[in-house]
From Swiss-Prot:
UniProt-annotated stretches for the region Disordered: 51-70
Self-association state and partner proteins as the record states: Part of the 50S ribosomal subunit.
One GO cellular component term noted in the UniProt record for this chain: ribosome
Role summary: One of the primary rRNA binding proteins, this protein initially binds near the 5'-end of the 23S rRNA. It is important during the early stages of 50S assembly. It makes multiple contacts with different domains of the 23S rRNA in the assembled 50S subunit and ribosome. Forms part of the polypeptide exit tunnel.
GO biological process: translation
Keyword terms of this UniProt record: Ribonucleoprotein, Ribosomal protein, RNA-binding, rRNA-binding
Record's protein name: Large ribosomal subunit protein uL4
One Gene Ontology term of the molecular function aspect: structural constituent of ribosome
Family under the similarity heading: Belongs to the universal ribosomal protein uL4 family.
TM annotation in the entry: none
Species of origin: Alkalilimnicola ehrlichii (strain ATCC BAA-1101 / DSM 17681 / MLHE-1)
Superkingdom, taxonomy of origin: Bacteria
Length: 205
């Protein structure tokens, strides 16, 4: 499979040959959905906790006597039906993580990259970066490439590139080990360097 290579001015400057094994897969919507849901589930803190009637402070004394008042009987002011009472089915901290096999995870990323390549949303460049942490310089580069709010995948994210991209809305910068399915699915376009492309190819082939 061939992908167009762009220069710094955004013009086509030859092409890059990539393996079909990494970028020629069919679109597997169900697999991508499963992996994205599992990834987001794993990102949940799972720390929420509520108190049952036994755990809420107070409520030890019977509010009024059992008989003779005309009111409904009550044994504690911390009953779940009372304001300020405990929860009937209190939430507990839990792990929301879902198991995803390595083959499934790689298969989902392969499918996403293949679809990006098919839709010409994968922009391959020789290199991307700035010599000083200036947002305007990076914005000018992206404008020349004709991309807006892209995910930038570099073989190495230096401090200047990170700082320059930080103030651009919708722009995200990652290296290859830092890629995840949510970032890829959410990206309008992906700008990737040749070196990073080779790393992805080796990883997913």
């Amino acid at each position: 499979m061939e992908l167009q290579l762009r220069n710094a001015q955004g013009q086509t400057d030859g092409s890059v040959q990539v393996a079909d094994a990494a970028f020629g897969d069919r679109f597997r919507e169900a697999l991508i959905h499963q992996v994205v849901v599992a990834y987001l589930a794993g990102a949940r803190a799972g720390t929420r906790a509520q108190k049952t009637r036994a755990e809420v402070r107070g409520g030890g004394a019977k509010p009024w006597r059992q008989k003779g008042t005309g009111r409904a009987r009550a044994g504690t002011i911390r009953s779940p039906i009372w304001v300020g009472g405990g929860r009937a089915f209190a939430a507990r901290p839990q792990d929301h993580g879902q198991k995803v096999n390595k083959k499934m995870y790689r298969g989902a990323l392969r499918s996403i990259f293949s679809e990006l390549a098919r839709q010409e949303r994968l922009v391959v460049v020789e290199s991307i970066g700035v010599d000083e942490p200036k947002t305007a310089k990076l914005a000018a580069q992206l404008e020349q490439l004709g991309v807006e709010r892209p995910l930038i995948v570099a073989d190495e994210v230096d401090q200047n590139l990170y700082l320059a991209a930080r103030n651009l809305p919708g722009v995200d910068v990652r290296d290859v080990p830092g890629l995840d399915p949510v970032a890829l699915v959410g990206a309008e376009q992906v700008v990737i360097t040749v070196q990073a492309l080779r790393q992805v190819e080796e990883w997913l082939s």
